[in-house]
Amino acid sequence: MGKKITKQDRESQISNICNDKNLSFVGWIGEYTNIKSTLTLKCNKCYYTWSPRLDNFLRITAQKCPACAGKARWTKEEREEQIKSKCAEKGYNFLSWSSTYINKDSKIILKCLKDGCIWDVSIHHFINHDTGCPDCASGGFNPNIPATFYIQKLTYQGTHFLKFGITGKDVLERMRQQSNKSLCEHSVIFSHTFSYGSMARGLEKVVKDSVNTGVLDKRILPDGYTETCHYSELETILSLTNSFIQENIR
């Protein structure tokens, strides 16, 4: 009969595995007695917590996070804890759900505590791809200095689309940056400069919430494809823009 492994030795064994797999050993459920005892683990990547039996965990194939492996179903409450943990790490606030929570593709609304930017992103991209504040990623959009809301006409294989957005740079310069890697022909058909970038950001959000966006594939327009829509939305966007300007510029 083999020597009984002590609790201390077991925890050392578990910790070594966890360090190698980017996991954290949280503790035991009940007292440790033998190989059939249950432990609690936490994934350091996605923050998922689960409780396997020790003998199951020690199998090589079981030494990975079930959520990262796509084998776990998250409750809404678990997702919110996961999101809040990630937000605390990144310097963001979790404001709300953009729509009803269904799965990893559901969208959330976040706020950057550094620059005040508010944006929406899917859980999958935020947690697994580390997608962060769009303003910080673009070099620091400043909400306190002038910025321009613009509309571009894009032509791809004979079909017209729209691309809207905001920039603290010259509109034509921004268009040249976007067109460098684009398969579309670009032209600016409307622009309005606000005294404060926060106003331009507010208008952009109004438009995003009102039209169907992301109609062009990222392979066609790598920079800014999420703010594309059908050309038939032009009148709607111009109407929203005029109303926004009249209501906010006194």
Swiss-Prot record:
UniProt xrefs under Pfam families: CapR (PF21817)
Entries under InterPro entries matching the protein: CapR_dom
Induction or repression: Expressed in the late phase of the viral replicative cycle.
Gene Ontology molecular function terms on file: DNA binding; endonuclease activity
Keyword Nucleus among UniProt keywords: no
UniProt keyword list: DNA-binding, Endonuclease, Hydrolase, Late protein, Nuclease
UniProt keyword annotation of Nuclease present: yes
EC number: 3.1.-.-
Function recorded in the entry: Putative endonuclease.
Protein name according to UniProt: Putative endonuclease
Organism: Escherichia phage T5
Taxonomy of the source species: Viruses, Duplodnaviria, Heunggongvirae, Uroviricota, Caudoviricetes
